Swiss-Prot record:
The active site is at residues 76, 151, 175. GO terms for biological process: translation. Gene3D superfamilies: Amidase signature (AS) domain. The gene is gatA. This is Glutamyl-tRNA(Gln) amidotransferase subunit A.
């Protein structure tokens, strides 16, 4: 049962081939057996999962249907879950049990999804490798010596290892799409405001967005259907009707205009990945898509702009974790200053501390105009580039990452090298656009992803293109050895 996709599970449950309780027990046993070598979970919720599975089976017995009813999932450990530890991968929140459910959690629970647990992540979602977690690094199921990507590495590794068919994740600068690329999954970052951020512990509030990680575009459509929608509790949520994402999957892409930015194929891109991207372009062209070279001239400025804006917002968001209001409190402080200093120094890891300091510096008097304001101006230019491009094309295609997954520890001493891995993903966050990564091949046995970007609220278009691609390729069906 563990090899089934979310769509296959939905059909199996509807046809009464197995029960949600049977499936849940099977997957929990599989996690117990195999996760010690992957480290994809921070917390397992066996008791909750079994009670939700029994309830889902009872709802089906009463005639209720639904693609998520009885389907097992997991939540990235920054979505608040009532009475269950929500750690953000940090010592700072190691003993925090949320008093309420995040909107994403409550919506999926109402749809009948079964929560198997909370997945590992980079501390406070800051990282591209899932090495900064207080609970240890996550291993890539395709090669346990390599990273799974971050910050949603736990969700990605759990799905890739066939512990469950799909999981929630978040994306601030590529944290859904990059792990999807590194673990041979399909991952979708929705339009900013499409999925509620209420109860989702913030890293950078103007960039964060929740979304699905799964093996196929079809599964992403199912999970996104349960996550998306307006939420009056989230001031950044946008009141836009949610379409039926599964309904448009089988639409022909003949005549669809796909733009390929020339700036994406620079010296920093692994030539083997470039070849796989070109192969995917040929596949889509063979399906009737029209390919056009485009330009995104300000793409080169994206990384410095992002690594001013995101840390600036993080330094503000994380100021509440001080040992007094929220979070870990040090023992036997000498005075109030010592309490603040030691609680934050001991509670936050090195990467979080680095980004807080960078952000505080960028917002400080004398540097605000030179750094933060200039970064926001670049953000506007990047958005303008996309708006101009979407006058000419319907979808933009390029590599998800410049390199395949690296070995664990290879970049820990060089944060800039890790930041540069976000080159192709962060622009979608800066502009608020939807983006999707889909499997496109392998380099040295490690998965490679291709990224698709679309105009605002065109998630259905991305899922349609990805589904048509997956009907004509088999990369997404490959399974890591040993899983």
């Amino acid at each position: 049962m563990h090899h089934m996709t979310l769509a296959e599970i939905a059909r199996g449950l509807a046809d009464k081939k197995f029960s949600s309780e049977e499936l849940t027990k099977t997957l929990l046993a599989r996690i117990a057996e195999h996760d010690p070598k992957v480290n994809s979970f921070i917390s397992l919720t066996e008791e909750l999962a079994l009670s939700q599975a029994k309830a889902a089976d009872a709802r089906r017995a009463n005639g209720e249907q639904g693609a998520l009813l009885g389907a097992p999932i997991a939540h990235k450990d920054l979505f608040c879950t009532q009475g269950i530890r929500t750690s953000c991968g940090s010592k700072m929140l190691d003993n925090f049990k949320a008093p309420y459910d995040a909107t994403v959690v409550s919506k999926l629970a109402a749809a009948g999804a079964v929560t198997l647990g909370k997945t590992n992540m980079d501390e406070f979602a800051m990282g591209s490798a899932n090495e900064s977690s207080y609970y240890g690094a996550v291993k890539n199921p395709w090669n346990l010596d390599h990273v799974p990507g971050g910050s949603s590495g736990g969700s990605a590794a759990a799905v890739a290892a066939r512990f469950l068919p799909a999981a929630t994740a978040t994306d601030t600068g590529g944290s859904i799409r990059q792990p999807a690329a590194f673990t041979n999954l399909t991952g979708l970052k929705p339009t900013y405001g499409r999925v509620s951020r209420w109860g989702m512990i913030a890293y950078a509030s103007s960039l964060d967005q929740g979304g699905p990680l799964a093996r196929t575009a079809e599964d992403c459509a199912i999970l996104l259907q349960g996550m998306a929608g307006f939420d009056k509790q989230d001031s950044t949520s946008i009141d836009e009707p949610v379409p039926d994402y599964s309904a448009s999957l089988n639409t022909s892409i003949k005549g669809l205009r796909i733009g390929v930015p020339k700036e994406y194929f620079s010296a920093g891109l692994d030539p083997r990945i470039a070849e796989l991207v070109h192969n995917s372009v040929k596949t889509l062209e063979g399906l009737g898509a029209v390919i056009k070279e485009i330009s995104l001239p300000n793409n080169q400025h994206a990384i410095p702009a992002y690594y001013v804006i995101a840390p600036a917002e993080a330094s503000s968001n994380l100021s509440r974790f001080d040992g007094v209001r929220f979070g870990y409190r040090c023992e036997n402080p000498k005075d109030l200053t010592d309490l603040y200093k030691r609680s934050r120094g001991e509670g936050f890891g090195a990467e979080v501390q680095r980004r807080i300091m960078v952000g505080a510096y960028a917002l400080s008097a004398g540097y605000y105009d030179a750094y933060y304001l200039k970064a926001q101006k670049i953000r506007r230019l990047i958005k303008n580039d996309f708006m101009a491009a979407f006058e000419e094309v319907d979808v933009i295609l390029g590599p998800t990452t410049p390199n395949p997954a690296w070995k664990i520890g290879a970049k820990t001493g060089d944060p800039i090298a890790e930041y540069l891995e976000d080159l192709y993903t962060i622009t979608a966050n800066l502009a608020g656009l939807p983006g999707l990564s889909m499997p496109a091949g392998f380099v040295d046995g490690l998965p490679v992803g291709v990224q698709l970007l679309a105009p605002y609220f065109q998630e259905g278009r991305l899922l349609n293109v990805a589904h048509q691609y997956q009907l004509n390729t088999d990369w997404h069906t490959r399974t890591p050895t040993g899983f």
